[in-house]
Structures are given as C-alpha cells and as structure tokens.
C-alpha cells in the first residue's frame, strides 16, 4: 500500500514503482555469476525459471515439446554471455521472443504468440534491459499498481531480481537483508509460492536473511507450503 515510500526517501533509498504504466523496466532474464547452487548448471535453473513464466502465461497448455524448445533457446541465448564471464548485457525476453519465431516448430510460434502481450505488447515491462539502479543499500519494490494481469508474472520477476542482487552482494562479501511485507500475497499464486519457498531455503547460503511480514496468519495456515515455512522459521 505504498507505506514505505516516505521512509525509503528519508534514508536516501531507491523506490522502484513497478506497474504496467511506469517507465521502469526489469529484465526477467538478468543472471548473475553464481546463479545456481555450487556445482550445478546455471542454465538448468534459468531455463526452469523461464518455463515458470510461460506456465504462468499459458497455464496447462505448456507441454513437453514447449519446454524442450524453451530449454534449447535459453542455452543458445546465454552461451556467449556465460562464456564471457557474465560480462556485458544479459539476454532479454525480447531476444527469446525473436529466437522462438525463428524456430521451425509450430509450438515455438505458439509460445511466441502466447507471450506477445508480455514481451512486445503493452505489458512488456519485463522484456527489456533493466533501466533502474538496484545497487542502493536500501531498495524497495512497490507493486501497488502492478495490476492483476501482471501481478503473478511480476512477483516472479521481482523475486528473481532480488536474488540476483543477493548474489552480487554475496560475491562482494556483503550481507543482505530481504524484508517482504504482506508476504501472504505470494501464497495466492502457485508459481510465486514455489519460487518464494526456494528463495527462503537458498538465501542463507548466500549470506542473506529473509523476513516475511503478514497480518493474515490464518489465511496462510491454510497453505501447506506456508505451514512448512512457519515450521522452519523463527518468530
């Protein structure tokens, strides 16, 4: 509800207002070095994340052929970026969209058309290079005006953006605190729930500490995932 804007401003922080009508752009395909757990292939995790975005858009229509095409394109798009030591510009969803349209399979064109609204269309705020600074010691993401169409997708991308920032700090030897107000909202969206729980487990390995704040404990206790989270947390 935008309550933190005065406090963030008073402390010289950065407030990032994320909505379909704002000029803010956050690249859903940003990927920092150390993205995967030790010894794991970062492309496997990134491919899974991008598949989650398409599953959020297309629902149960995403099948094994769609997933194979996404995985193939992700490997191609990131190959030079990773080979270059994660320097330069990350690929974008626009790059992925263009590559999908170049594939031979009908399913690739289905993926491109289904995601068009969120890539080249009017809701494409996560399909371009990130244009906001996220390196302030105090950074707040405001999703008040995100809207129902963008909310499920936006939650995934913002969590991904926060995770990338945690990785930057971890590699620089810095500790990160992540506070999520009204975090019961995340448990209304299955894919956001899954990602949120994964972050809850992984951040401690990256010298980061995550705090969830909610007044709706009763609502959350109806969720099996939320009950697991409470059982593995301090109060």
Language-model-derived ranges and their functions:
Residues 4-6:
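Rossmann-like S-adenosyl-L-methionine
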Residues 9-13, 18-22, 27-208, 212, ...:
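P-loop NTPase motor domains
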Residues 220-235:
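C-terminal regions of RecA-like/P-loop NTPase motor modules
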Residues 1:
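Glycine-rich phosphate-binding P-loop
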Residues 216-217:
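The feature captures the ABC ATPase H-loop/switch
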């Amino acid at each position: 509800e935008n309550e933190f804007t005065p406090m963030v401003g008073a402390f010289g922080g950065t407030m990032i207002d994320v909505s379909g009508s704002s000029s803010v752009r956050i690249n859903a395909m940003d990927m920092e070095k150390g993205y995967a757990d030790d010894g794991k292939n970062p492309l496997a995790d990134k491919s899974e994340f991008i598949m989650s975005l398409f599953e959020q858009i297309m629902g149960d229509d995403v099948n094994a052929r769609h997933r194979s095409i996404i995985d193939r394109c992700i490997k191609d798009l990131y190959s030079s970026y990773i080979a270059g030591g994660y320097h330069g510009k990350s690929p974008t969803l626009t790059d992925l969209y263009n590559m999908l349209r170049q594939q031979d399979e009908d399913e690739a064109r289905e993926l491109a058309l289904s995601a068009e609204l969120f890539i080249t269309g009017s809701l494409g705020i996560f399909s371009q290079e990130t244009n906001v600074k996220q390196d302030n010691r105090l950074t707040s993401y405001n999703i008040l005006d995100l809207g129902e169409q963008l909310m499920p997708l936006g939650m995934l991308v913002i969590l991904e953006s926060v995770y990338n920032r945690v990785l930057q700090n971890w590699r620089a030897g810095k500790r990160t605190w992540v506070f999520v107000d009204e975090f019961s909202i995340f448990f209304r969206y299955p894919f956001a729930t899954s990602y949120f729980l994964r972050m809850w487990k992984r951040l401690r390995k990256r010298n980061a500490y995550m705090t969830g704040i909610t007044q709706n404990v009763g609502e959350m206790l109806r969720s099996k995932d939320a009950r697991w989270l409470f059982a593995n947390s301090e109060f």
